[in-house]
Amino acid sequence: MRKKCSVCLWILVLLLSCLSGKSAYAATSTTIAKHIGNSNPLIDHHLGADPVALTYNGRVYIYMSSDDYEYNSNGTIKDNSFANLNRVFVISSADMVNWTDHGAIPVAGANGANGGRGIAKWAGASWAPSIAVKKINGKDKFFLYFANSGGGIGVLTADSPIGPWTDPIGKPLVTPSTPGMSGVVWLFDPAVFVDDDGTGYLYAGGGVPGVSNPTQGQWANPKTARVIKLGPDMTSVVGSASTIDAPFMFEDSGLHKYNGTYYYSYCINFGGTHPADKPPGEIGYMTSSSPMGPFTYRGHFLKNPGAFFGGGGNNHHAVFNFKNEWYVVYHAQTVSSALFGAGKGYRSPHINKLVHNADGSIQEVAANYAGVTQISNLNPYNRVEAETFAWNGRILTEKSTAPGGPVNNQHVTSIQNGDWIAVGNADFGAGGARSFKANVASTLGGKIEVRLDSADGKLVGTLNVPSTGGAQTWREIETAVSGATGVHKVFFVFTGTGTGNLFNFDYWQFTQR
């Protein structure tokens, strides 16, 4: 469905460009919202909302609600109704700039959702995921929590951060009837935290009581946030949930630990009269000496995304540590705004640094398009999945039949003349590269131009892609390269004369001299 919707989107872009008398593509296709040199949004070839991070084995994984464009009968874009939030998108990176697309986890399975492939057969939706890893019986086990709309929390398990996933209990983990959950207006937005002793905790909840006419007291102290202890198996709960009296609570629970202190963070609501230290739509935070609370309000650290990027909407975040640096991942309506001039409620993931002060307070985050810098160089002499890139000129990704990772290998597709992908800071070394190979599949054929630092930069090699006999008939092709030494952005520019998708692109690798 995402592929179909995305194709419809590019048709719309082409039609609009024709009406304006301008080509939708120049000699090389332009970026949408993540422009060359910037790190935000993390991706712009598809959307992703409510992001949360997991760091594992030298990579950071970002899990997101499956925002996807909805269309009116005339082909125009609707405002987001969240009807497509039944999957979880996953991307990962070792360097914070080049992101690998791992595709979608088909979470919800009720009423034939996800084409009957949905994992949680009882769930009609999968909103706002959270993720944790814990060693159980000597083996790392991964736990993906999600909200079934606003009615409860479910959990999936896997032996790797990208699956395959199963539903271990076949029902919700937490519902309104769970002890201590009474009074929660929206039982959603889970945040899971595993403490140093291996004990897990689940935070969730939101909303303001009073239905359509809350009082000032209800706006100020909704008392709709909860924390409950998880069992050793992470798929059961222990005892009763405790209330977190988060002032002006709206949604979006988060928990991180810094210097022995527990930080509960959340999105402040938009109603009533707010004091200056609790501004509407921003991320507030509280601290405690215990993961179960009580928590004390300390301040706020992330303005509503509309303050930085326009578009407004809800604010959703997660704080994480990666290679001894603290970051916050959040969403903003940047990609949809770039395409349509208005966000329409469709969101994309961003990351900026987060700083704790010496007194334990958190500095205001300066959200921006620049984002974070690349923390390590990419090794071009390793096999690199084509769906790993920092920037792109209007391509798509889709599930592949080519042999790849343990689950859900992807490839780059919807390749037209002038499209491209690029990676940041590949280190060829002093000796440089002597050859380049790629795994491709094609009915039409074309070329991959290998260029340095820009889409029209120094040409170091050209790979001719023949027809392989089909869009899923894979063949590894190799060509000589010259002049690729040192550290560079690497652009793979696609050319060809055929109509339609020129070829599919699975992976690439350089050989060292």
From Swiss-Prot:
| Family annotation (CDD domains) | CBM6_xylanase-like, GH43_XynD-like
The name this protein carries in UniProt is: Arabinoxylan arabinofuranohydrolase
Q: Where is the CBM6 domain?
A: 382-511
Q: Which domain of life is it from?
A: Bacteria
Q: Which SUPFAM superfamilies match?
A: Arabinanase/levansucrase/invertase (SSF75005), Galactose-binding domain-like (SSF49785)
Q: Which UniProt keywords apply?
A: Calcium, Carbohydrate metabolism, Glycosidase, Hydrolase, Metal-binding, Polysaccharide degradation, Secreted, Signal, Xylan degradation
Instruction: Report the pathway entry.
Output: Glycan degradation; xylan degradation
Family label: Belongs to the glycosyl hydrolase 43 family.
Q: Which positions carry the signal peptide feature in this UniProt record?
A: 1-26
Question: InterPro entries from the xrefs?
Answer: CBM6, Cellulose-bd_IV, Galactose-bd-like_sf, Glyco_hydro_43, Glyco_hydro_beta-prop_sf, Glycosyl_Hydrlase_43_Enz
Marked site: Important for catalytic activity, responsible for pKa modulation of the active site Glu and correct orientation of both the proton donor and substrate: D189
Q: Which GO terms describe its molecular function?
A: alpha-L-arabinofuranosidase activity; carbohydrate binding; metal ion binding
What is the organism of origin for this protein? Bacillus subtilis (strain 168)
Question: Temperature behavior, per UniProt?
Answer: Optimum temperature is 45 degrees Celsius. Thermostable for 40 min from 4 to 45 degrees Celsius.
Q: Which GO terms describe its cellular component?
A: extracellular region
Residues noted as binding Ca(2+) in the record, renumbered to the chain: E385, E387, N409, Q410, D506
For this protein, what is the EC number? 3.2.1.55
